[in-house]
């Protein structure tokens, strides 16, 4: 059976339950944590394998072109945590720490880097630097608006 057929079957099975609870998430993690309950075991296993294959030798996750990218790493980590793929966390932690501490991040990569850093490493001098950089970035963006 093809991936999308299995996915559709899993979604239908979930939707057809007699009692469907509405989800009002405040965070992405609680929603993703429900994925293993919604999808069948074969699909969860396939997604786990995909996540592991997408991690590069650098420790981050590959974009569509195969290059390691913070944006893709953010989503890779969210999915890995939801599906309990713990093997990817330590290499990702090292990748994020190295990249954030040794690069000048801007735009979406700044935000992804800050989220990943606080999630994987925690609070320290670097996370405070990222926080100040984001505040500065937001102030500049607001002041440039008409």
List each language-model region with its residue ranges.
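Preference for long, amphipathic alpha-helical scaffolds in soluble/luminal domains
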Residues: 1-146
